[in-house]
């Protein structure tokens, strides 16, 4: 069966709707992932995802779990739209007379989609990580200040709390990065983002397409929406875990603020080498469980919205009065 002609506006709208719904549902888990990945040996603020979320609520309130969400909600629409539309475009260009794509061509289409999306993904992740990790650094400094005060007072209760550091905002961060580093400041970690997102797309899109094909009743029908959802969840979580080592390195490289006694890095290889040497190979899987929990529903929801054709329906309603 020939693929239907791509409607770019519809694909962009579908990707945007899916991104907004998905981010709203899973952002607290993404915050826990960032904070767990940024923990280096020594001071460990959080033992697990649940411990991180509980401590975040206690110290920063419920909305502390959504710190940095505004950046994601603003930029996830173009990011997801570019990713899904680019994959559709490349699949359409690589197909011949509607024939099923071979695996190498599916991987090539995914590679193209992953490369296109980093235009938006890199600055979005750069800003989001600073906002998400600010609470961890503030809590660590407060704890260390309290411990130091206890030591000087001989075990008595601390009489004065450490002054709270002002919370950064996305606007302040953007202004500072542009003023001090130019546009390159927003694209710090671009190489690491490419090394994460291109392999992710190479794994995700072919795996999703084949899993979704398995649940299709016949070659002339679409897969049921629940099949698309499950295929998106399975493919998303598998791809997320596969590229988690690159995500750990990317998160460390894009973090501007460091906690006490935490390493600094000069580049991707330097970061990977120091993580291996100081924390062991298991450190590359930090946050993998959280990342799978984030990506699975995010891409499951995305594919359901995409395959239900919500945007096509909306655009059709808008065009009806003109008919």
UniProtKB/Swiss-Prot annotation:
GO terms for cellular component: mitochondrial inner membrane. It is a multi-pass membrane protein. The keyword Repeat applies. InterPro entries: Mit_carrier, Mito_Solute_Carrier, Mitochondrial_sb/sol_carrier, Mt_carrier_dom_sf. It catalyses: L-glutamate(in) + H(+)(in) = L-glutamate(out) + H(+)(out). Pfam families: Mito_carr. PROSITE patterns: SOLCAR. GO terms for molecular function: amino acid:proton symporter activity; L-aspartate transmembrane transporter activity; L-glutamate transmembrane transporter activity. Mitochondrial glutamate/H(+) symporter. Responsible for the transport of glutamate from the cytosol into the mitochondrial matrix with the concomitant import of a proton. Plays a role in the control of glucose-stimulated insulin secretion. This is Mitochondrial glutamate carrier 1.
């Amino acid at each position: 069966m020939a693929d239907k002609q791509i409607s770019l506006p519809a694909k962009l709208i579908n990707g945007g709707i899916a991104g907004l719904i998905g981010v709203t549902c899973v952002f607290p888990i993404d915050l826990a992932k960032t904070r767990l990945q940024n923990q280096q040996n020594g001071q460990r603020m959080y033992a697990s995802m649940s411990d991180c979320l509980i401590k975040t609520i206690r110290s920063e309130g419920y909305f502390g779990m959504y710190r940095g969400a505004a950046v994601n909600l603003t930029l996830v629409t173009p990011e997801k739209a570019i990713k899904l539309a680019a994959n559709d475009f490349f699949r359409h260009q690589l197909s011949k007379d509607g024939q099923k794509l071979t695996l190498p061509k599916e991987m090539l289409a995914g590679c193209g989609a992953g490369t296109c999306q980093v235009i938006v993904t890199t600055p979005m992740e750069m800003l989001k990580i600073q906002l998400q990790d600010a609470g961890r650094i503030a809590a660590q400094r407060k704890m260390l200040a309290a411990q130091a005060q206890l030591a000087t007072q001989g075990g008595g209760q601390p009489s004065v709390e450490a002054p709270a550091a002002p919370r950064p905002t996305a606007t302040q961060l953007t202004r500072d990065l542009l003023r001090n580093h130019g546009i390159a400041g927003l694209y710090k970690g671009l190489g690491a983002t490419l090394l994460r997102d291109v392999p992710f797309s190479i794994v995700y899109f072919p795996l999703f397409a084949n899993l979704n094909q398995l649940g299709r009743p016949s070659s002339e029908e679409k897969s049921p929406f629940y099949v698309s959802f499950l295929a998106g969840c399975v493919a998303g979580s598998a791809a997320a875990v596969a590229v988690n080592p690159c995500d750990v390195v990317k998160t460390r490289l894009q973090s501007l603020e460091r906690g006490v006694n935490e390493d600094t890095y000069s580049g991707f290889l330097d970061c990977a080498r120091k993580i291996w040497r100081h924390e062991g190979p298991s450190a590359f899987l930090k946050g993998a469980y959280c990342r799978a929990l984030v990506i699975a529903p995010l891409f499951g929801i995305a594919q359901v919205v995409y395959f239900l054709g919500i945007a096509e329906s909306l655009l059709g309603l808008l065009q009806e009065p003109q008919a």
